[in-house]
Design a protein with these regions (language model features):
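Inter-Walker segment of RecA-like/P-loop motor cores
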Residues: 36-82
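A short beta-strand-to-loop transition that corresponds to the Sensor-1 phosphate-sensing loop
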Residues: 31, 71-73, 116-121
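ASCE P-loop NTPase helicase motor core
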Residues: 43-49, 53-62, 93-184
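Walker A/P-loop
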Residues: 1-13
Length: 247
């Protein structure tokens, strides 16, 4: 579900592991902005609980641990290795490429890979990876193997036949577990059923119900980092040159 603190939780987990073991931690996010959320959480955790000011990217701890925060469009990302966290992977364009890069970064048995995200569309490249269909592909023996049901994945998570541990946390589950920052009945009343289910009940959108397919929208995307004449931190990002505007 959205807004239940998953990014903060994994930021704390990674920081704790870095402090206790000295292992490198790598954070891959759908965008540079999302990657900065991870970094800001860790900086705030260190300041709030330990009175330590962390700076830089990567963040380097006194025990040698490095914490790197990267958007998925960084082609140099695969040169690093360590425990890997992939945030909002159901919203990452070209997930297949991301998964290849992620696999290379966490090849060694000692490294752990954690994927987590809110759901998007069933046509997203990551959907077969989540359901296990990608693992079953090309093998009659694997095709007959059943994966845990949605309800079973909500019940504390399960280790699945492909070796992955999967866990679904809906807003209902979060509230039952002590989350008290949202009123689920107000949320149900605010949205139509389909929107509520996608945002808070971990239900994927079926593209047949959409005006545009997710793949069509993906094709319209652009990597802003490739714009050599654009400075997002400037008062006038494109200087005094003419630009097209749209919505």
């Amino acid at each position: 579900s959205r807004q239940i603190g998953a990014t903060w939780y994994f930021a704390f987990e990674a920081f704790e592991n870095a402090v206790m073991t000295g292992d490198p931690q790598i954070f891959l996010s759908a965008s540079k902005v999302q990657a900065e959320y991870f970094r800001s959480y860790i900086v705030n955790i260190a300041e709030q609980y330990f009175g330590i000011t962390l700076t830089g990217n990567p963040i380097r701890l006194s025990n040698g641990a490095e914490l790197r925060f990267l958007p998925t469009n960084k082609n140099t990302a695969q040169s690093y290795s360590g425990h890997l966290y992939c945030d909002e992977y159901f919203w990452v364009p070209n997930f297949t490429k991301l998964n290849e890069v992620a696999s290379a970064m966490a090849t060694h048995d000692k490294w752990r890979t954690t994927y987590f995200s809110t759901p998007s569309a069933k046509t997203h490249q990551a959907y077969p990876f989540w359901t296990g269909d990608e693992w079953k592909q090309g093998s009659k023996k694997r095709t007959a193997i059943k994966f845990p049901t949605f309800d079973e994945l909500r019940d504390g998570g399960r280790v699945c036949p492909d070796g992955q541990w999967r866990y679904v946390i809906t807003m209902e589950d979060a509230i039952a577990g002590g989350f008290n920052l949202a009123n689920i009945e107000k949320l149900r009343n605010r949205y139509n059923t389909a929107t509520f289910n996608m945002l808070y009940m971990c239900v994927f959108v079926d593209s047949k119900d959409s005006v545009f397919s997710f793949s069509d929208l993906e094709a319209c995307g652009v990597e802003v980092d490739t714009w050599q004449d654009h400075n997002p931190d400037a008062a006038r990002p494109f200087g005094d040159r003419p630009v097209w505007g749209g919505f």
